[in-house]
Amino acid sequence: MVNEHKAHASFMFKIINVFVSFGFNLILGILIYDIFFNIDENLVVACILIAMPIIAFLILILTGGVHKELTYLQIYDKYKLMCEFIREITISTITSELATIATMILYQLQNPIKTITFLLLLIAFLAFGLIFTKLLIDAYFITLKKLKSLKE
């Protein structure tokens, strides 16, 4: 039998992952489009400011729901759910980073900017992506280590 609180928390974690990924992809998409097609900065800010408060509000509501559901679980189950959440958000972040790199390459082929500028942007994006992914992987291993110590 499935613990209903664990199922609710897991489902809310998955929805949080979707909203975080959407926000991440939205910002990356707008910035990359701005770099290659030089759209108006006010439009960039407006696009981000319209969507982000809605996404942040939904994430906040869902985080409160997850916190409520986690109060009913044992500490082992909490860490197990956190491991799953961190693993899923890491995978979706890596997917977003790779999709953004592919988009940058396609935009460079279609609407080229200076090669040195493109390479610097690509290197900066890769560095940011690797650092962010490394932090997520470190968080996963720390949570996994705590989970293993609780299992013993």
Curated annotation (Swiss-Prot):
Transmembrane region(s): 15-35, 43-63, 117-137
Protein origin, superkingdom: Archaea
Family annotation (InterPro entries): DUF5418
Gene Ontology CC, one term: plasma membrane
Keyword field: Cell membrane, Membrane, Transmembrane, Transmembrane helix
Pfam families referenced in this protein's UniProt entry, alphabetically: DUF5418
Membrane topology: Multi-pass membrane protein
Subcellular locations according to the entry: Cell membrane
Sequence similarity: To M.jannaschii MJ0129 and MJ0587.
Protein known as: Uncharacterized protein MJ0554
Annotated organism of origin: Methanocaldococcus jannaschii (strain ATCC 43067 / DSM 2661 / JAL-1 / JCM 10045 / NBRC 100440) (Methanococcus jannaschii)
